[in-house]
């Protein structure tokens, strides 16, 4: 049985299921919300170990938080870091199923 480092679960926070992410999945790409301090090598290692796939490349982006007004009260959204993971040919991840 393979052993998974518990820190990998801290790197990958959640899959992103949006229209744009669904279109990217047709091109062998998967989008994850990741920890803000996570680096590309950490993300690559976590995805390879957790999902048992080979990663070709990792691209990251940070969506800056915004100030919003809700019922007259000001609030702020946090920054969100996303990783677009490109998988090798023949590898797939189904994000609708759990780990």
Curated annotation (Swiss-Prot):
Keywords: Ribonucleoprotein, Ribosomal protein, RNA-binding, rRNA-binding. PROSITE patterns: RIBOSOMAL_L23. One of its GO terms (biological process) is translation. It holds the Pfam family Ribosomal_L23. InterPro entries: Nucleotide-bd_a/b_plait_sf, Ribosomal_uL23-like, Ribosomal_uL23/eL15/eS24_sf, Ribosomal_uL23_CS. GO terms for molecular function: rRNA binding; structural constituent of ribosome. One of its GO terms (cellular component) is ribonucleoprotein complex. It comes from the Bacteria. One of the early assembly proteins it binds 23S rRNA. One of the proteins that surrounds the polypeptide exit tunnel on the outside of the ribosome. Forms the main docking site for trigger factor binding to the ribosome. NCBIfam families: PRK05738.1-3 (NF004359), PRK05738.1-5 (NF004360), PRK05738.2-4 (NF004363). Part of the 50S ribosomal subunit. Contacts protein L29, and trigger factor when it is bound to the ribosome. Belongs to the universal ribosomal protein uL23 family. This is Large ribosomal subunit protein uL23. It comes from Rhodopseudomonas palustris (strain BisB18).
């Amino acid at each position: 049985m393979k052993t998974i480092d518990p820190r990998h679960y801290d790197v990958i926070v959640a899959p992103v299921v949006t229209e744009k992410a669904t279109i990217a999945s047709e091109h062998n790409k998967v989008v994850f919300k990741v920890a803000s301090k996570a680096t590309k090598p950490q993300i690559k290692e976590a995805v390879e170990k957790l999902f048992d796939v080979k990663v070709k490349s990792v691209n990251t982006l940070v969506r800056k938080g915004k100030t919003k007004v809700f019922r007259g009260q000001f609030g702020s959204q946090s920054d969100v870091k996303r990783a677009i993971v490109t998988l090798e040919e023949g590898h797939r991840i189904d994000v609708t199923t759990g780990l």
